[in-house]
Amino acid sequence: AAVHAAAILLLPQLERGQRVDASVLRSAMESAFGASDASGAWDWKTAYDACEAATVLFMRKYGKSLLRRAGSPAALLPLLGKIVGLLPTQTRRSEESQAFQQFSTPISLGIAAVTAAAITPTDRVLEPSAGTGLLAILAEIAGGSLVLNELAELRAGLLSLLFPAEPVTRFDAAQ
């Protein structure tokens, strides 16, 4: 729940087109968790998850109108590139991220995948390793209904908050 709270705190930065630097991110995380990373309450990989969750919230709020305004998925890419460019690069890893092999789908690849899949409202989209929901939100914007799965406990909990209408399963998708 604290990661989600941090994402909500970061969303206005994205809405204003303001960069989320390390100090802004640290402030949001400390406010949401009530403690610093030095205390062990959170790590930087969790902070990056909060940034991705803020992107999901941004896309849910503005994604459809941005796509309409852009006219095509290809024309949407530069707009989304500007949003993603406001976020810090993910330079730090955690033991959990290595153990679960957590690698986020870049939004440009997500747009390509959703476009290639030609998702319609009649499609049910399975996201077997949904992470923070970056690919799932694009499928949702395209009109597909979602089936979400995430093994990692923190990310599964975050998905439940980001996609409250969708159940989140916790199977090992690698098996």
Language-model-detected regions and their locations in the chain:
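Class I S-adenosyl-L-methionine-dependent methyltransferase catalytic core
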Residues: 1-175
